[in-house]
Amino acid sequence: MSSSPPQHDLGHCDGDDFLARYTLHSRAEILFQLRALQKRKVLVNLDLSESRQIIVTSVLAVNEADNTVVLDSARGDALNNELMSGKGAEFVAQLDGVSISFSIGAVSLCEYEKLPALRIPVPTSLIRLQRREHFRVPLPIANPVKCIVPSPWEESKEQITTHLVDIGCGGVALTDIGARLGTESGRLLRGCRLLLPETDVVVTTLEIRNSAQIRLQNGSFQTRLGCKFVDLPNDMAAHLQRFVMNIERARRNRL
């Protein structure tokens, strides 16, 4: 699965000026990025503006001649209908630690290799942004990395087991089945234990920055939380950085 959408910390500069420096307008460069996503079979998030749901999809084809991109269709008519309603959606993906995003234009249904698919126009501009704190590496689904979170509710002593979707030096995305941790932006989750393989347990506070309901292929939903580290101790940060580097090195060696 793909990671949650990156939160761009604009600091003291104007957001429009900041993003303008990372916006591609060259058609050739935009097509190159889209084809890289297709070739690498990168999972893509389509963030629906109105319902705040996320569709997980992938790029199936890039057609330069008719100026279209073909995406895997959503699982469910309601989500497909919302996409085609013109209410707005954002295309977000991560390629080698670089965030690639653009606003989606008109969406239509089509067929690709005799299966239902979605067709969108090739964007006229595309944001390509990498900053150290936004660099995330996806974690394997087959052997999920656990994060144990004490319940944020005072009356509960429950230890909630979650699975990490991706991880970086600035934060993590995790799945919360049953929405037991809440989704309020700014909520602090204290005493979280990241059970990283082949390294010491990382203990930290996580701050919820964003949340989304993810529709799985079997039709069920799960809550995905994008969180940042708060006051991560230096020794824990060192363990974390080594882990991220090892995961990324192993991923590159498999390419």
UniProtKB/Swiss-Prot annotation:
GO terms for biological process: bacterial-type flagellum-dependent cell motility; regulation of bacterial-type flagellum-dependent cell motility by regulation of motor speed. The keyword Transferase does not apply. Keywords: Bacterial flagellum, c-di-GMP, Nucleotide-binding. This is Flagellar brake protein YcgR. Acts as a flagellar brake, regulating swimming and swarming in a bis-(3'-5') cyclic diguanylic acid (c-di-GMP)-dependent manner. Binds 1 c-di-GMP dimer per subunit. Increasing levels of c-di-GMP lead to decreased motility. InterPro entries: PilZ_domain, Split_barrel_FMN-bd, T3SS_YcgR, T3SS_YcgR_PilZN. Residues 130-245 form the PilZ domain. Its main location: other. GO terms for molecular function: cyclic-di-GMP binding. Monomer. Interacts with the flagellar basal bodies. It comes from Thiobacillus denitrificans (strain ATCC 25259 / T1). It holds the Pfam family PilZN. It is found in: Bacterial flagellum basal body. It comes from the Bacteria. The keyword Nucleotide-binding applies.
